[in-house]
Amino acid sequence: MHETDMTRALIQTLRDWWQSQPGQPQIARVHLVVGQFTCVEPASLTFAYAAQTQGTFLQGSQLVIRETPLIAYCHPCGQEYKPEIGRRYACPNCGSPMEEIRSGRELKIDYIEIDYIECSTNFTPPAQPEVA
């Protein structure tokens, strides 16, 4: 289960960011973008995250995963398509082998939501624009 190792790396990245923040705010949600071609199982990643964040600065935070589909581009016929394993990922129009992946390999932190209510008194949230 490589999701366990990925979760460890994710937690370390989040810890490095969190320690650099004024007042070390409470993290409510971590939003990830995970491509279908990464072979990461979202349910396993969510389980590993919940287990590994117990007793840490991330305890109680939620992992939100947005999957991106595998999209390829065929240079000979100039079309984007969704590769299928049954076709050996070849272009359904002309049969050319998959050359360029345009989407589906992503594995990144999209953004982090902070729970301002739980923040320490040293943390000041950004000013909100006045509504007329």
Curated annotation (Swiss-Prot):
Belongs to the HypA/HybF family. Keywords: Metal-binding, Nickel, Zinc. It comes from Synechococcus sp. (strain JA-2-3B'a(2-13)). Involved in the maturation of [NiFe] hydrogenases. Required for nickel insertion into the metal center of the hydrogenase. The gene is hypA. The keyword Ubl conjugation does not apply. InterPro entries: HypA/HybF. The keyword Nucleotidyltransferase does not apply. This is Hydrogenase maturation factor HypA. GO terms for molecular function: nickel cation binding; zinc ion binding. It holds the Pfam family HypA. One of its GO terms (biological process) is protein modification process. Zn(2+) binds at C74, C77, C91, C94. Ni(2+) binds at H2.
